[in-house]
């Protein structure tokens, strides 16, 4: 199975100070992962909003792409090809889930609010006793 990462999952993996960094990294090993232009651009936007320079954010993304070699897929579907988009809320998330579905994949996310059969919520870390 291949998982297309949404922006939240990619940011949590690449930003060590992110509150869900450990959660995503516990789920990550051994999985086949993919990114697309939307998730890459989203990472750059969020990393800069968190205080990174664009140059540093681009370097982090480039190192990830080089070292972890996720599958890259183009955004080759028109928005109108995503029948699951029925409201203005979550349009990008649903588009990404439909993009993954078109390839027989799932969308890896930290967002509990994505109502799509292909959206897989990355599980919480177990709480120690």
Language-model segments: residues:
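Active-site neighborhoods of divalent-metal-dependent phosphate/nucleic-acid chemistry enzymes
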Residues: 67-113
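Short glycine/serine- and small hydrophobic-enriched flexible loop segments
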Residues: 45-49, 101
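A generic structural signal for short hydrophobic patches within well-formed alpha-helices
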Residues: 10, 40-43, 114-115
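A structural signal for short, well-ordered beta-strand segments and their strand-loop junctions
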Residues: 4, 34-37, 72, 107-109
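Active-site regions of enzymes building and remodeling cell-envelope glycoconjugates
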Residues: 118-129
